[in-house]
Regions:
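Active-site cofactor/cluster-binding pocket
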Residues: 1-177
């Protein structure tokens, strides 16, 4: 899947926007066309957060993603809100630790991955978002693997460099899941 039109959604504080930045930065590393559009609910932490990320080899007409071919959701309200927007043939990756009721659609692939539980079990609390990005990469190969590592190097702030290795471990956990 060379072009990815994705929506990532969950509660504020789950790292949705960070995960979107990792995907967008991977496209930047590869000098591809990209857009990253964040959306916040009225509250930050605990409110709703989502972002649209598009990576393409062609010019992108709009940063808005209305019919994603990839959806990552980290809570039930986000699943319920976005499931019907996924384009036929698209992929949904849901954190099944927190998304318990998954509506079925015959025209898309839905992957239930207990990312929060997996991350906590591996000592990676708070990195379920990156576990889900790893799973998305494993299913779509939306960029070169090295580009994801470079993106993490770029996106993790200098004052939190100790988090680089943990994010890469979470990414690998998702890839192997």
């Amino acid at each position: 899947m060379r072009e990815i039109r994705s929506i990532l959604a969950g509660f504020g504080g789950q790292g949705i926007l960070f995960a979107g930045k990792v995907i967008a930065s991977a496209g930047l590393v590869e000098d591809r066309e990209l857009s990253w559009l964040p959306s916040y609910g009225p509250e930050m932490r605990g409110g709703t957060a989502s972002c649209s990320v598009t990576l393409s080899d062609e010019p992108i007409g709009s940063p808005l993603v209305m019919d994603p071919n990839a959806l990552i959701v980290m809570n039930q309200p986000s699943y319920d809100k976005f499931i019907d927007t996924v384009a036929p043939g698209g992929i949904v990756i849901a954190d099944s630790t927190l998304v318990l009721n998954m509506k079925e659609r015959a025209d898309i692939t839905v992957v239930a991955l207990p990312a929060t539980e997996m991350a906590e079990k591996e000592g990676l609390k708070g990195l379920a978002n990156i576990v889900l990005v790893g799973k998305l990469w494993a299913l779509t190969n939306f960029c070169a693997r090295e580009s994801l590592d470079a993106a993490i190097d770029h996106v993790v702030p200098a004052k939190k460099q100790a988090m680089v290795a943990l994010n890469k471990k979470a990414l690998e956990l998702g890839i192997q899941a």
